[in-house]
């Protein structure tokens, strides 16, 4: 994959739009999950305060960029929230941003050994250059720098495998190359869930649940046209990449994919 610095900047700015995309507009509809598997509870734990302490999230900047945080969201960032992670349209923006921060900063085999590791223009991608709510710099300053989670080698392996085979309708890149906010966020979510014991099947279901939350129109289309797909199949390049969705789903379903949610 070859790209010049200027081309990378143009791509990143085109994806991010007017700056950091924080999920100011959430499309209507609940997540659509064909072939749903019941998932174990997932918890934030001390992820929030660890991200804040590392400077990946500056709470004041995040509040300003998003127009404010709820009391529950503030409690999550302080580490005072003890309930399960809620996954619904009201939580969509906060999930996107917090998982984005985690996927960006967490030291991982995906970032250290995947295509991002040799991508010279990584600092100018939407997932890095678009992250402007860190304390000390843009997203590339934190990229693959912090041990927020302590993943075992087996957990790293399962995340790498699922990241290699999950796509998003805004581009043709797998989660293994998290070049936008959605890719980085899904990586962070997979890492957190794997660290809490999720197996491969459960990770695919979680990934589909989140993707369908962030791209509701696209996954409504997939569910309507291909109701019998497993989560792993629905997330494959054939259906969930931009070109795959356009080829196999868009002919029958109106919709569009954008990192601007």
Where are the model-predicted features located?
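Polar/charged alpha-helical tracts
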Residues: 5-6, 71, 75, 127, ...
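Amphipathic, positively biased hydrophobic alpha-helical segments used for protein targeting
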Residues: 23-25, 114, 255
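Hydrophobic membrane-insertion alpha-helices, especially the h-region
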Residues: 12-24
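N-terminal Sec-pathway targeting helices
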Residues: 1-15
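Membrane-interface motif at the C-terminal end of an N-terminal transmembrane signal
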Residues: 22-33
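A cross-kingdom marker for long, charged
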Residues: 168-169, 178, 184-261
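Acidic/His-rich structured neighborhood in mature extracellular/periplasmic domains
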Residues: 36-184, 199-202
């Amino acid at each position: 994959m070859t790209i010049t610095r200027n081309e990378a900047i143009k791509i990143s700015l085109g994806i991010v739009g007017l700056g950091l995309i924080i999920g100011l507009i959430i499309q209507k509809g609940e997540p659509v999950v064909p072939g749903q598997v019941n998932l174990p509870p997932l918890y934030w734990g001390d992820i929030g305060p660890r991200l804040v302490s590392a400077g990946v999230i500056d709470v004041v900047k995040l509040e300003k960029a998003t127009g404010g945080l709820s009391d529950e969201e503030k409690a999550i960032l302080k580490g005072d929230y003890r309930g399960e992670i809620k996954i619904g349209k009201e939580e969509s923006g906060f999930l996107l941003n917090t998982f984005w921060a985690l996927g960006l900063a967490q030291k991982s085999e995906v970032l250290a050994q995947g295509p991002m590791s040799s991508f010279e223009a990584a600092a100018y991608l939407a997932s890095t250059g678009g992250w402007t709510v860190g304390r000390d710099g843009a997203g590339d300053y934190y990229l693959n720098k912090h041990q927020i989670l302590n993943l075992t080698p087996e957990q790293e392996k399962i995340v790498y495998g699922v990241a290699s085979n999950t796509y998003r309708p805004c581009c043709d890149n797998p989660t293994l190359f998290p070049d936008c906010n959605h890719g980085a966020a899904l990586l962070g979510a997979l890492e957190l869930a794997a660290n809490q014991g999720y197996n491969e099947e459960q990770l695919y279901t979680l990934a589909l649940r989140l993707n369908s939350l962030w791209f509701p129109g696209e996954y409504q289309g997939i569910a309507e046209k291909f109701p019998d797909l497993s989560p792993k199949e629905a997330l494959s390049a054939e259906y969930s990449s931009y070109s795959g969705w356009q080829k196999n789903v868009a002919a029958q379903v109106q919709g569009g994919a954008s990192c601007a949610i």
